[in-house]
Design a protein with these regions (language model features):
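Non-heme Fe(II)/2-oxoglutarate
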Residues: 1-93
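Catalytic core of non-heme Fe(II) oxygenases with the double-stranded beta-helix
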Residues: 87-198
Length: 198
């Protein structure tokens, strides 16, 4: 896994080749098994419009933390999240904040033709996203956009990802094609007394 810390236009970490080849293949097998069980927005957690209360997303998802606590995808992702990642981040204050996270919630989402997630914020301190799909890329659109930062855009390439502050407004425009999966980890520090050094 390769990690690159960027300070502009806001502090974030770009991730490449997140899973090894063997891990990626195991992830794809697990995705195929989970796919029929993914739920619509009303049942899979979603940010909602402040005035109407309607879901801001149109995709399918499942919280793996509750539904599949022994998920291989989650186990593989955790293997790369701390020592391997922070050894590549040359920013002590960011590293300190990242290490303090002691609570994780994992979600798997699927975006297919016409699906999207309107601009919203997350309740997490950090949000980690990893994109997965089988090559060749079976869709267009669906990149990650930060509208408050001049539409700063992160392409959702296979086996890549990003870590950013959850309260930053972000969105996913509609996808055209058969789509992709997103593995999301919402992290936070629930109890500072429980913080361990990783």
């Amino acid at each position: 896994m390769k990690a690159k810390f960027l300070i502009e236009p806001f502090p974030h970490v770009l991730l490449e080749d997140y899973f090894t080849k063997g891990e990626w293949e195991a992830c794809i097998r697990e995705l195929r098994k989970l796919d029929p069980h993914l739920l619509p927005p009303e049942f899979s957690g979603t940010a909602r419009h402040k005035e109407t209360g309607r879901p801001l997303k149109f995709n399918s998802g499942l919280f793996l933390t509750e539904a599949m606590p022994n998920s291989e995808i989650v186990q593989f992702a955790r293997n790369h999240m701390y020592q391997e990642l922070v050894s590549q981040v040359d920013c002590s204050w960011w590293e300190s904040q990242w290490r303090q996270n002691n609570s994780q919630s994992w979600m798997l989402s699927r975006y297919i033709d016409g699906q999207y997630y309107n601009a919203h914020v997350d309740l997490s301190q950090f949000t980690l996203l990893i994109w997965l799909y089988q090559e060749p890329k079976p869709f267009t659109g669906g990149d990650l956009i930060f509208p408050d930062y001049n539409n700063y855009t992160i392409p959702c390439n296979n086996n890549t990802g990003i870590i950013f502050y959850g309260p930053l407004r972000h969105e996913v425009p509609p996808i055209k094609g058969s789509g992709r999966y997103t593995l999301t980890c919402f992290t936070s520090c629930q109890n500072p007394a429980l913080v361990s050094t990783r």
